[in-house]
Amino acid sequence: MTDSVSVVIPALNEERTVAHVVRACLADEPLEVIVIDADSSDETAAEAQAAGARVLNWREILPEDPRPGKGESLWRGVVAAEGDIVVFIDADLESAAPGMVSALTEPFIDPHIQMVKARYQRSFQGKPTGGGRVTELTAKPLVRQFFPELAHIDQPLGGEYALRRAAAMELPFVEGYGVEAGLLLDVAKR
């Protein structure tokens, strides 16, 4: 793949896990790994920087004050990113591992691909499934009902995914934690 890759890690008080996530992402040698710190009150920024990330406070990126929520961190990360592909990874992903960024970007060899969502197993009621309680009982049934073409998506709410930066610049990023589902639906409608 010849597209350049930026990794954006939104973070708020994730000092315990952010360095691990940064190191896992850097192992795949992206153009850059950016941690967007949403005014953490702990050592998140210092831990991320020590691990090799470029750390930006979300207030530094745009002149307007940030609106509260994860979507704002993600949007500001897109604005700050320089890569053709933007990979989003949650700062608290304890299972982050080398190869994760490459796996999310490989499908972009197809120029028609606009978004790639991670797929991983989480148990629910003692059975391996694609997601936790909210995903299995709410998100996936709603997606199957109203967007059957997306029924194959195991993690519609997951925070690990990649977008072409050009497409991301045209999408609305909602403020709260529904941002992942919103982006998925918006990309599907394009």
Q: Residue ranges of each PLM-predicted region?
A:
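Cell-envelope/extracellular polymer assembly enzymes that use nucleotide-activated donors
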Residues: S4-S6, E32, G182, V187
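Short, well-formed alpha-helical segments that are part of the catalytic scaffolds
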Residues: N13-A27
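Conserved donor nucleotide-binding strand/loop of the catalytic core
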Residues: L31, A45-R76, A80
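A conserved acidic beta->alpha catalytic loop
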Residues: D37-A46
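Acceptor/aglycone-binding surface of glycosyltransferases and processive sugar-polymer synthases
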Residues: L62-R76, A96-A167
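Short aromatic/hydrophobic "clamp" motif used to bind/position activated sugar donors
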Residues: V86
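The conserved acidic donor/metal-binding loop of glycosyltransferases
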Residues: D90-S95
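A short, conserved alpha-helix in the catalytic core of glycosyltransferases
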Residues: A167, G176-R190
